[in-house]
Amino acid sequence: MNKKTLLVIFFVTMLIVDEVNSFRFGSFLKKVWKSKLAKKLRSKGKQLLKDYANRVLNGPEEEAAAPAERRR
């Protein structure tokens, strides 16, 4: 790469860093937390956690059918 290309990349990077540093994450995170997708993910996570807790407390479920005896 030549010097001009590197200089352009440097300036673009500095502009991006400046924009990121001036960005307020609090309002962004609040919007993300209240989004429909986040609500669906949280409800799915809660359901999976409840299922896991029930499996741990109740032990593994018994198999529905016992293995059949082998014929000789």
UniProtKB/Swiss-Prot annotation:
<dbReference type="GO" id="GO:0030414">
    <property type="term" value="F:peptidase inhibitor activity"/>
</dbReference>
<comment type="similarity">
    <text>Belongs to the non-disulfide-bridged peptide (NDBP) superfamily. Long chain multifunctional peptide (group 2) family.</text>
</comment>
<feature type="propeptide">
    <location>
        <begin position="70"/>
        <end position="72"/>
    </location>
</feature>
<keyword id="KW-0964">Secreted</keyword>
<keyword id="KW-0481">Metalloenzyme inhibitor</keyword>
<keyword id="KW-0646">Protease inhibitor</keyword>
<keyword id="KW-0483">Metalloprotease inhibitor</keyword>
<feature type="signal peptide">
    <location>
        <begin position="1"/>
        <end position="22"/>
    </location>
</feature>
<keyword id="KW-0382">Hypotensive agent</keyword>
<protein>
    <recommendedName>
        <fullName>Bradykinin-potentiating peptide NDBP6</fullName>
    </recommendedName>
</protein>
<keyword id="KW-0165">Cleavage on pair of basic residues</keyword>
<dbReference type="GO" id="GO:0005576">
    <property type="term" value="C:extracellular region"/>
</dbReference>
<keyword id="KW-0800">Toxin</keyword>
<dbReference type="GO" id="GO:0008217">
    <property type="term" value="P:regulation of blood pressure"/>
</dbReference>
<dbReference type="GO" id="GO:0090729">
    <property type="term" value="F:toxin activity"/>
</dbReference>
<keyword id="KW-0732">Signal</keyword>
<comment type="function">
    <text>Amphipathic peptide that shows bradykinin potentiating activity and antimicrobial activities against bacteria and fungi. Has higher antibacterial activities against Gram-negative than against Gram-positive bacteria. Also inhibits NADPH oxidase-dependent superoxide production (IC(50) is 0.4 uM on granulocytes stimulated with PMA, IC(50) is 0.51 uM on HL-60 cells undifferentiated and IC(50) is 0.53 uM on HL-60 cells treated with DMSO). The C-terminal peptide shows a higher bradykinin potentiating activity than the complete peptide.</text>
</comment>
